[in-house]
Amino acid sequence: MIISAASDYRAAAQRILPPFLFHYMDGGAYSEYTLRRNVEDLSEVALRQRILKNMSDLSLETTLFNEKLSMPVALAPVGLCGMYARRGEVQAAKAADAHGIPFTLSTVSVCPIEEVAPAIKRPMWFQLYVLRDRGFMRNALERAKAAGCSTLVFTVDMPTPGARYRDAHSGMSGPNAAMRRYLQAVTHPQWAWDVGLNGRPHDLGNISAYLGKPTGLEDYIGWLGNNFDPSISWKDLEWIRDFWDGPMVIKGILDPEDARDAVRFGADGIVVSNHGGRQLDGVLSSARALPAIADAVKGDIAILADSGIRNGLDVVRMIALGADTVLLGRAFLYALATAGQAGVANLLNLIEKEMKVAMTLTGAKSISEITQDSLVQELSKAPAAALAPMAKGNAA
């Protein structure tokens, strides 16, 4: 298959992966309305073409948390990367490192912190969930610090897991799930050889190091399901702020008031995110939520954004809507599943080229010059208008 655009990796990954894995990464919560709107709303943001601007000295470089980035992109924390390619977290981290951008290791990674961190030169970021077992959280933070992780990404939009109906149909969960997964694996030989046989151990490395090695995937799912904490509040985060002395980013912000609370709390950054449409279906897409949040806290805190970003044009759109940097999730996972480290490296090259074209044709020589002026104003203002209170006479 010819890979000429980032979108080509999705089709390639679907051919290679057993259905339970493809649909686990590709699916969302409930009817997947927000999952679809993430992509569609962002694609409808119109760029403003400008010409004859002498763009010969264009630069994508930026700085975030005192780290130099080759472009305003980081790889998002994505669970189970090691089930999509052999030791997948290591391969993705190496690709990000070679491109000069951060890699974020998920709490629920297959490869543990101690395996991934030594494989790259720049410090990686680490993502942590709020869990009832504070002992695990402290253990994970201590290990992340010992491994030299520079930035903590704290995911707060998962006090309880979202209902992902696709998983029951695909075999990730539901009746006879283990047998269905086995049958799918043996009928996908490329994956079975690369990951099924040669990518072991298939456990959640950061958790097994704390609990010991559970007997199967269901044991991890059960432990995690029992440990998500719906009682969490800002007060519960204070001990983490005291314990972690590096940059701390709050992931899962969709409301301007929550963004202001993050500033008051003392966070260094936020991620405008709906968890890729995997938590609460029907919430705003990140593209629609971002402008109002930027209006509220831009300049007071670093603003990152994810959900729906599939190519370099989308990166430019998110920056113009108010983000300082974006996180890539599904986009890099499709590439990882298709061709491992080389796939992610090629994806990042494609995104960089697409960004350069978009910046050249919108007249933005640097990341700081990508602003609302880079957008067609009537359309770029539309997402923020979605947050305005509905007039009583227009209620439906």
From Swiss-Prot:
Boundaries of every FMN hydroxy acid dehydrogenase domain copy: 1-380
Binding-site residues for FMN, renumbered to this chain: 106, 127, 155, 251, 306-330
GO cellular component, one term: plasma membrane
Cysteine-cysteine disulfides: none
Molecular function terms from GO: FMN binding; L-lactate dehydrogenase activity
PROSITE patterns in the cross-refs: FMN_HYDROXY_ACID_DH_1 (PS00557), FMN_HYDROXY_ACID_DH_2 (PS51349)
Membrane protein topology class: Peripheral membrane protein
Subcellular locations according to the entry: Cell inner membrane
Active site: 275
Keyword ATP-binding included in the entry's annotation: no
Function per UniProt: Catalyzes the conversion of L-lactate to pyruvate. Is coupled to the respiratory chain.
HAMAP family hit by this protein: L_lact_dehydr
This protein's name: L-lactate dehydrogenase
Gene: lldD
